[in-house]
Amino acid sequence: MKSLDDLDFDNRFARLGGAFSTEVLPDPIAEPRLVVASPAALALLDLPAETSDEALFAELFGGHKLWSEAEPRAMVYSGHQFGSYNPRLGDGRGLLLGEVINQAGEHWDLHLKGAGQTPYSRMGDGRAVLRSSIREFLASEALPALGIPSSRALCVIGSSTPVWREKKESAATLLRLAPSHVRFGHFEYFYYTRQHDQLKQLAAFVLEHHFADCNAAERPYAAMFRQVVERNAELIARWQAYGFCHGVMNTDNMSILGITFDYGPYAFLDDFDANHICNHSDDAGRYSFSNQVPIAHWNLAALAQALTPLVEVDELRASLDLFLPLYQAHYLDLMRRRLGLGVAAENDHALVQELLQRMQGSAVDYSLFFRRLGEETPERALASLRDDFVDREAFDRWAEAYRRRVEEEGGDQESRRRRMHAVNPLYVLRNYLAQQAIEAAEQGDYTEVRLLHQVLSRPFEEQPGMERFTRRPPDWGRHLEISCSS
């Protein structure tokens, strides 16, 4: 085991030079204290699960102390925001502190969010608030537990530093981990500023360190883009299958690695609503739940445009054309498993789509439906779920088709139950649960956020005494729309 003050650094991105990032020191927050830490994220750096030295966490991630090998830098990038190109974005409040190598030889970026102003702050104060930091922490650890690729969160540090958003709040920092923080927007920045040498340098860097297997291809950059398409097709399929709505799918929020990145006003669906908008700033619904698939394809096309100096257009188009069929195959496989079906059949797509149509407008809890479906035999489970649907005759027709499908596959109920419970979570990160934890933390009580994080780290297992985390939201907590303000 390593200790927190003795990490091994190898700052590869910093060595790219000043065209890619600017050296900036963290601006300390006042009276830093540890709010919550993730044992699973600590393990990625070979650190012990217990956080016995909370003062050291607070010093390092509150901006008061740096490792001697750290090289904090603010990265420059651009991006399309709500469909419009913004030529200069960059890390406006976050710093890449450096890259740590664990005992397995893996590199992990240490990125401190809320570290103060940078050259890219665009009139902002460079701070993050406790509210948004807790939300990002919880999601960063909840999604991987569900099998959804994501950046990770090591810890949240609170403070007494005041910041003003819609109201006065307290500043916080979040330490984010990821194998890379390179975004689609990095490539767009060098493309639109016509810095094609730097564009190629960035592509070579990403190829060498994150897509090394593509080096053997006849055209490595084309092979790399194809893998980016493949990874994003699987990622979005997992979002859709588990009812995750990102909320701000700007190209600067898209990771080149195909992982969930830059959490803002996200939400997991409570009642199923294909048109759910979780971001109250998204008046047109560009990033609604149902739009995430076409928007991901649009974003990949924006990345493809930025790669045209390196890859032939026909090759880029061919890879883009793979996105939808790859997405559909991944999504159908995930939904088949959620329904307890192990063998593909011709009518599976229709079975899934019919279920979603029956759910729409019926106030059916998306996550609990699948969990309850596996609790008992299909006949009993379907009978108990029937009352949740508005058009019960239509549901009965779907239920009969599903029952026949299960019967065709055969197998015993206990095996079916175990199989379904392994992929259908009992605990999901509902917005109202996060809000309750945030409100307690804002009063200095971190018990709830730590407990919620602990529960969400094992979403498929029944945890005695934690029944309250399985409940549907109260009236005040239904269909919460979250602000981008953070």
Curated annotation (Swiss-Prot):
Cysteines joined through disulfide linkages: none
Binding-site list for ATP: 90, 92-93, 113, 125-126, 176, 183, 262
Pfam families xref list: SelO
Catalytic activity as recorded in UniProt: L-seryl-[protein] + ATP = 3-O-(5'-adenylyl)-L-seryl-[protein] + diphosphate; L-threonyl-[protein] + ATP = 3-O-(5'-adenylyl)-L-threonyl-[protein] + diphosphate; L-tyrosyl-[protein] + ATP = O-(5'-adenylyl)-L-tyrosyl-[protein] + diphosphate; L-histidyl-[protein] + UTP = N(tele)-(5'-uridylyl)-L-histidyl-[protein] + diphosphate
Cofactors named for this entry: Mg(2+); Mn(2+)
InterPro entries: SelO (IPR003846)
E.C. number(s) listed in UniProt: 2.7.7.-, 2.7.7.108
One MF term in the entry's GO annotations: ATP binding
Active site: 252 (proton acceptor)
Keyword annotations from UniProtKB, A to Z: ATP-binding, Magnesium, Manganese, Metal-binding, Nucleotide-binding, Nucleotidyltransferase, Transferase
Superkingdom of the organism of origin: Bacteria
Function: Nucleotidyltransferase involved in the post-translational modification of proteins. It can catalyze the addition of adenosine monophosphate (AMP) or uridine monophosphate (UMP) to a protein, resulting in modifications known as AMPylation and UMPylation.
UniProt-recorded name of the protein: Protein nucleotidyltransferase YdiU
Protein's organism: Pseudomonas aeruginosa (strain ATCC 15692 / DSM 22644 / CIP 104116 / JCM 14847 / LMG 12228 / 1C / PRS 101 / PAO1)
Gene that specifies this protein: ydiU
